[in-house]
């Protein structure tokens, strides 16, 4: 299985090129790039007021207001500090790099900016991991509508944090492949005693979402992760967040890859079958004959 990168490689590499060109003394060039990411996230890389030495990176998330309720602004201040700048119109967060003042850790800065989406998501997980660590119970469940008609639920208890993703399967085939994929995850957990418990429910929401407005339907699936203190403590939580916030994209990416592989195998088998049929086709009878003098004639039966 393929693990998707948690950072946006286009942003990271674009900023690294800008830094390296500036370090080499090359004249800065203007930039105006818009980039789409998973979950409807949009980025915009541009110059501020036409100044080619000032590069602004902005991110837009449809669900950012819901993340703000769980400390997204505070987490971004902690992660980006002085890099934060006035937010570009139409976006939620903006950071600024100055090509006239290149820091020694410019590569790390480019990597951190490439993690903007991940760090926005991280706020809700860190908040509920802290609730669990402090033994707080009875806190309101977090509800993040991270995609159209798809929702993330996070709830903390003294001994665990439960994370539930709702997702929509666009095709009946997707449901079947999704079930097989989730079965593989459950089988994989048997080989690793430190892996979290993973549950999958189709059509009906899990018991954790009983008496809520969670959707019901033939194309609805719910994936539940049960995270224990070994997954949420200070030493391991960053890796847990890295993996879990991308899970929905990871699931659907592998569903699409599986379908593409099945289709390619079907096309290959069809091609092989056609070759067999073509070899079995009888050769047309040649009824044209020649006389001893070299003249030709066709025999008509």
From Swiss-Prot:
SUPFAM superfamilies: Arp2/3 complex subunits (SSF69645). Pfam families: P34-Arc. One of its GO terms (molecular function) is actin filament binding. Residues 281-291 have a biased composition (Basic and acidic residues). GO terms for biological process: actin filament polymerization; Arp2/3 complex-mediated actin nucleation; cell projection assembly; cortical actin cytoskeleton organization; regulation of cell shape. Disulfide bonds: none annotated. It is found in: Cytoplasm, Cytoskeleton. It comes from the Eukaryota. Belongs to the ARPC2 family. This is Actin-related protein 2/3 complex subunit 2. It comes from Drosophila melanogaster (Fruit fly).
């Amino acid at each position: 299985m393929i693990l998707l990168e948690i950072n946006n490689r286009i942003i990271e590499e674009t900023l690294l090129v800008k830094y390296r060109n500036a370090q080499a003394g090359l004249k800065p060039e203007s930039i105006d790039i818009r980039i789409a990411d998973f979950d409807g996230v949009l980025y915009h890389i541009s110059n501020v007021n036409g100044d080619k030495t000032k590069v602004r990176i902005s991110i837009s998330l449809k669900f950012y207001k819901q993340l703000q309720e769980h400390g997204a602004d505070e987490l971004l201040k902690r992660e980006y500090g002085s890099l934060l700048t006035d937010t570009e119109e139409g976006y939620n967060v903006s950071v600024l790099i100055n090509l006239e003042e290149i820091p020694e850790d410019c590569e790390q800065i480019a990597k951190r900016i490439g993690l903007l989406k991940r760090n926005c998501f991280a706020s809700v997980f860190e908040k509920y991991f802290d609730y669990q660590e402090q033994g707080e119970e009875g806190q309101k469940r977090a509800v993040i509508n991270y995609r159209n008609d798809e929702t993330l639920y996070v709830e903390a208890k003294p001994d665990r944090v439960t994370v539930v993703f709702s997702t929509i399967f666009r095709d009946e085939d997707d449901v079947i492949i999704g079930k097989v994929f989730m079965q593989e995850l459950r089988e994989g957990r048997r080989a690793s005693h430190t892996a979290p418990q993973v549950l999958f429910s189709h059509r009906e929401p899990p018991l954790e979402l009983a008496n809520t407005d969670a959707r019901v339907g033939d194309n609805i699936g719910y994936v539940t992760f049960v995270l224990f203190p070994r997954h949420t403590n200070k030493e391991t939580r960053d890796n847990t967040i890295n993996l879990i916030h991308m899970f929905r994209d990871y699931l659907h990416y592998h569903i699409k890859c599986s379908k593409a592989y099945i289709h390619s195998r079907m096309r290959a088998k069809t091609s092989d079958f056609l070759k067999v049929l073509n070899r079995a086709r009888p050769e047309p009878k040649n009824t044209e004959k020649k006389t001893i003098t070299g003249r030709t004639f066709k025999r008509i039966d």
